[in-house]
């Protein structure tokens, strides 16, 4: 497929995943505004926060935890499993249960745990059993409208949480920083959208480099969850193998595992997501780690996050990755939306 022939993308992209990616900046802004308006009852003092969810419904919490890591004064963890950890108990614990469909069994398990343990709880979803049970239990529900895959609703999963934390008084108003971020995203988007030719489109060129390779995404600091997002987008959108690694931890193990089996070395591709706002030593580590990979014969590249703030850099790196994963899917002649193995597993689990 010629990536310059963007009018033919719809022959592969039968459910228009491209539209969802194009709309991410607007979705992020819409979600924050919605979250500032939805009903929120008064809450008791909070000493810990747990966000329970899976997949595309959990990544927004990952992103928020990373974004706020330098300013949030209470512990905030993302829980991807069934029963909540033992410390999630009592009125001083806030449990946020997020499920796009409202039927995710792990999220439902976490919700029931939270109610049993007397936690303050709020539900974020489009519908399903989760909202039904929340309404019966008298738990606040933040319902949003979105038709599509959970991974395409990352603006909602992040933006609603950003508004929630603002309204709880955990962080200052984010309106100005969000407006700046949307501007950065819009300017980036103008350079990487589908109608921009390959010669001028760095996202399309990057996708071309990934074809036939096993992709490893490296990041550090607050960009670590963006590396996870790149990995999961490659899995779900391009139906391709990918892993993510976090610096500095990867320098204490992964770096030693790049030699064997020797015949696979040249099938690897290491992508480094850089931030000018990261810890100076991590910036050095990212550069040195990339050098070592190159010396071992592994192809590498990097993306420098755009903007001057953590929020802008977080989201610009995410948006660029979403476009790269999409163009990779097109080059693989793969529909970006359907995920048959995941659907099959869910059906098997409910049989």
Features from the language model and the residues they span:
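Polybasic, low-complexity association/targeting segments
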Residues: 1-16
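Active-site phosphate/pyrophosphate-binding segments
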Residues: 13-20, 27, 35, 39, ...
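Short helix-capping/linker segments at secondary-structure and domain boundaries
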Residues: 33-34, 73, 164-174, 238-239, ...
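Glycine-rich phosphate-binding loops that contact phosphosugars or nucleotide phosphates
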Residues: 44-188, 208, 275-299
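A generic structural motif
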Residues: 79-80, 240-252, 299-308
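C-terminal active-site/capping subdomain that shapes the small-molecule cofactor and substrate pocket
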Residues: 255-340
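Short, small/acidic-rich helices and loops at N termini and domain boundaries
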Residues: 337-350
